[in-house]
Design a protein with these regions (language model features):
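C-terminal motif of bacterial Sec signal peptides marking the signal peptidase cleavage site
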Residues: 5-8
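Short, polar/proline-rich extracytoplasmic segments that appear immediately after membrane translocation
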Residues: 12-28, 40, 291-338
Length: 338
């Protein structure tokens, strides 16, 4: 099982104009994503905070897209004397009880954010030192705060072994954190640059289900993506090391697949047997570690996408049919006279 990190780039701006030239206006961009996620075209609203001289100027104001323009109420105006304004934006909008942007370096902006079902693409944007004299429109370039996940499965294939048929019923993650504190950078998140958010105090490990549906049959070498629940966004985190205890229990971050393996030509089941741990309805779980000493990826970073390619074969420890060959010698019947 491997991981591939995929990058992205930004779309064009959606610009707006207000009648009052001194009002604070916004334009919005969102980085492209390799899969279904929020984009410049699909984002519809965000929350914004603003600070002047360290004092709160806008407090969790909801900005909504209406006919390709961004509107909010009440309209805010640029401060006098060309004073700088720092803007912090989050999408989708966050309840006031959950967001505590304070414009202080190192202080979390969202505390206790919970990634409940992995379907929300959380975005953030920062605009520092904007002034009326230099800023006609606040160009808000959002970045993805979470990590995006994709899981592909395929059967093991080798010229040295008989072809396999694999049946998969479910796929889930084990022991990944679902709650944490988000801190936005104190630098402008422009289209270029690597000013990323950071996460801290990750907690509440859970085991989200990625796929649970009809049996998927793997009978060729083409990979199949599994996702029936919509879970594709995970909390950035250092993955808990994957270990197996002496009691055969797993600890740490794993992918768990409920499956069965057959010989393709004869249809004979090769794994699991009825004595396999966790055996149920002809299937059992295979475990694939996410974080070991040899793993190429041991953490999920904000704004990165990870594609896990899982190859399923006959598990290690299963009995291979070997042959020990002997040939009986011909019996000596002696000499026969005819």
């Amino acid at each position: 099982m491997g991981a591939v990190v995929i990058g992205g780039c930004s779309n064009d701006d959606l610009n707006i104009n207000f009648d009052d030239e001194n009002a604070i206006d916004f334009s919005v961009t969102v980085p492209r994503s390799p899969r279904t996620a929020t984009t410049t075209e699909s984002i519809n609203e965000f929350s914004v905070w603003a600070f002047v001289d360290g004092n709160k100027f806008m407090d969790n104001v909801t900005v909504v897209k209406n006919n390709n323009s961004w509107q909010y109420s009440p309209t805010m105006y640029w401060p006098a004397d060309d004073k700088a304004v720092n803007f912090y934006s989050i999408s989708p909008k966050i309840p006031k009880s959950e967001a505590t942007v304070v414009n202080t370096p190192g202080t979390p902006d969202i505390t206790g954010y919970t990634n409940t079902d992995g379907t929300t693409d959380l975005l953030y944007a920062v605009n520092m030192d904007e002034t009326a004299g230099t800023t006609s429109v606040v160009k808000v370039n959002f970045r993805h705060a979470l990590s995006q996940l994709q899981f592909n499965v395929r059967r093991y294939s080798s010229d040295a072994t008989s072809p396999l048929r694999v049946e998969v019923k479910s796929l889930e993650l084990l022991n990944v954190y679902s709650k944490g504190n988000l801190t936005m950078p104190r630098q402008t998140t422009g289209i270029s640059g690597e000013n990323l958010s950071s996460w801290s105090s990750q907690s509440e490990p859970n085991s989200p289900v990625i796929y649970d549906g009809n049996v998927v049959v793997l009978d060729n070498d083409n990979p199949v993506e599994l996702n029936s629940t919509g879970y594709m966004f995970a909390l950035p985190q250092t993955l808990v090391p994957s270990v197996t205890s002496a009691s055969a229990s797993v600890q740490g971050a794993y992918v768990r697949v409920l499956c069965a393996v057959y010989d393709q030509e004869s249809g004979v089941k090769l794994w699991p047997s009825q004595t396999t741990q966790g055996y149920s309805d002809g299937m059992a779980y295979l475990y694939f570690p996410l974080s070991t000493s040899g793993s190429s990826v041991k953490e999920w970073r904000p704004g990165y996408a990870y594609r896990y390619n899982i190859t399923i074969g006959v598990p290690a420890g299963s009995s291979v049919i070997d042959f020990d060959v002997t040939v009986d010698g011909y019996k000596d019947f002696g000499n026969l006279d005819i």
